[in-house]
Amino acid sequence: MSERGHRRTQNGVVVSDKMDKTVVVKVDRLIKHPVYNKYIKRSAKYKVHDENNVCKIGDRVQIIECRPLSKDKRWNLKQISN
């Protein structure tokens, strides 16, 4: 375990790169409906810090949780896995 403790990581796809040093990443997950036992796809969009502006739309990326960087940014870019 690192000195910062356990930080969550997630995988997603870049859906917007229009901001400076920030990309929007869409993360999909499957949840099971409690009554019908059917799996439903849910998604969330996170603003992610991209220091060098290397991400492009459609890139598959891995993001890691960090301290709050702004009002909406709480994730850092870990790696691009294209």
Swiss-Prot record:
One GO biological process term is:
translation
Highest taxon of source: Bacteria
Keywords attached to this entry: Ribonucleoprotein, Ribosomal protein, RNA-binding, rRNA-binding
Q: Name one GO cellular component term.
A: cytosolic small ribosomal subunit
Q: Name one GO molecular function term.
A: rRNA binding
- PANTHER family, per the entry: 40S RIBOSOMAL PROTEIN S11 FAMILY MEMBER, SMALL RIBOSOMAL SUBUNIT PROTEIN US17M
Summary of subunit composition and partner proteins = Part of the 30S ribosomal subunit.
State its role. One of the primary rRNA binding proteins, it binds specifically to the 5'-end of 16S ribosomal RNA.
- What protein family does this chain belong to? Belongs to the universal ribosomal protein uS17 family.
NCBIfam families linked to this entry: PRK05610.1, uS17_bact
Name listed for the protein in its UniProt record: Small ribosomal subunit protein uS17
